[in-house]
């Protein structure tokens, strides 16, 4: 394929050289004359294992050339890949100046030459969700008018790590392709055909957000690990032993579990132990800001779900909650976030009914009994049978524990809080 790469930094240059090594004809575009000159002389401006040899090979075989002229490749290439930087602005947002400028340059060149063949423009820079719809497509429409359809925009984020970028290019953890209709892009499929990785073809906004989710989670893991490390060092605990034990658990710790957006955490263990760990941290002055934020974040999610539940709902409306325990298939109500939600609904003046197949008020004992009735004194009166849950009309049904899938509900307005 004939491919242009805009922006020859770590991502762009690595991509250009790797694509050239696969036999594609690649044109690299960058605003820096010095960078272009160095690359064409066979000297990589970035330090990346294996890249110098691959660059020399690509130049020797005539598969890579570089230019400062953004319009140069537009006449002949099938794909243009945008890898320009999106540095932080003073307010923390991404500075989109270079994204906008490259988009204008590509569109202007396509307009000037009267390009008729479809050009796929692939964005790999990290961009805020909504950027393609709110910035890129309007620029194309303004520059090309009725001919804007000649350019097909795709978002295909990169997952390269500096120092292992070449390996990561050929062995990505996944391939994410964002298109206007969530359907595959044939040119991008052809470009990626040698890559063996799970492929997710989605809409623009989902693809745009993926990179933020990934990078923030990586940062979260590093910050959490370092907080644990600080506590271990201060307490005289061997952090390497703790780390080894932690990562050995691939069923829960290093796994997909607890990563599905849904209900807040609760129950008799997590809230109690998080608070206790916060207390230990405060005692020893470990400054564990990530751990300290856990309960606040959980409370914020509880508020979010309540606000979502009552949006547009008048006081007195009939509400059915499916599930009251902190998770399904248990009757443990201790620190259940669903208890908090039920209490707020009652305080808000809503007519609340609750169906939980695992819960019988007369069977509650001990702390479970005390917690339930201290928060919901009229709990027995609110519990309804499966028949009532299925056959009575409710203004809204809140599925807190995933019970809706086992019921034939008459009410159609069901909010899934078990899995957002």
Predicted regions and their residues:
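Structural/interface elements that position substrates and couple domains in central-metabolism enzymes
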Residues: 1-420
């Amino acid at each position: 394929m004939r491919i242009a790469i805009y922006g020859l930094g770590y991502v762009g240059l690595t991509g250009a050289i790797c694509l050239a090594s696969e036999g594609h004809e690649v044109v690299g575009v960058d605003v820096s004359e010095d960078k272009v000159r160095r690359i064409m002389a066979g000297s990589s401006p970035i330090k990346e294992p294996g890249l110098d040899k691959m660059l020399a090979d690509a130049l020797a075989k005539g598969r890579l050339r570089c230019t400062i002229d953004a319009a140069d490749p537009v006449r002949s290439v099938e794909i243009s890949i945008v890898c320009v930087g999106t540095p932080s602005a003073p307010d923390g947002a991404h500075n989109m100046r270079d994204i906008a400028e490259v988009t204008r340059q590509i569109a202007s060149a396509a307009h000037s030459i009267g390009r008729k063949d479809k050009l796929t423009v692939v964005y790999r820079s990290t961009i805020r969700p909504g950027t393609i719809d709110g910035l890129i497509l309007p620029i194309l429409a303004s520059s090309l008018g009725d001919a804007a359809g000649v350019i097909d925009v795709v978002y295909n984020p990169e997952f390269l790590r500096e120092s292992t970028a070449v390996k990561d290019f050929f062995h990505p953890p996944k391939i994410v392709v964002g298109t206007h209709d969530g359907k595959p892009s044939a040119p991008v499929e052809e470009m990626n055909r040698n890559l063996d990785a799970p492929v997710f073809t989605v809409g623009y906004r989902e693809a745009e957000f993926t990179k933020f989710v990934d990078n923030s989670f990586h940062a979260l893991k590093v910050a959490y690990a370092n907080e644990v490390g600080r506590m271990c060092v201060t307490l005289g605990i061997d952090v390497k032993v703790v780390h080894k034990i932690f990562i050995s658990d691939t069923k829960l710790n290093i796994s997909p579990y607890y990563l599905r957006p849904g209900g807040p955490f609760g129950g008799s263990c997590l809230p109690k132990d998080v608070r206790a760990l916060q207390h230990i941290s405060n005692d020893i002055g470990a400054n564990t800001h990530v751990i300290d934020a856990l309960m606040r974040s959980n409370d914020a999610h509880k508020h979010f779900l309540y606000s979502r539940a009552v949006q547009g709902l008048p006081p007195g409306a009939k509400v059915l909650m499916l599930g009251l325990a902190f998770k399904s298939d248990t009757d443990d109500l201790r620190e259940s976030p669903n208890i908090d939600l039920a209490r707020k609904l009652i305080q808000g003046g809503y007519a609340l009914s609750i169906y939980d197949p695992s819960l019988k008020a007369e069977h509650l004992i001990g702390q479970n009994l005390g917690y339930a009735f201290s928060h919901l004194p009229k709990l027995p009166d609110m519990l309804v049978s499966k028949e009532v849950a299925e056959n009575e009309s409710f203004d809204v049904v809140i599925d807190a524990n995933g019970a809706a899938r086992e019921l034939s509900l008459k009410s159609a307005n069901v909010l899934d809080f078990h899995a957002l």
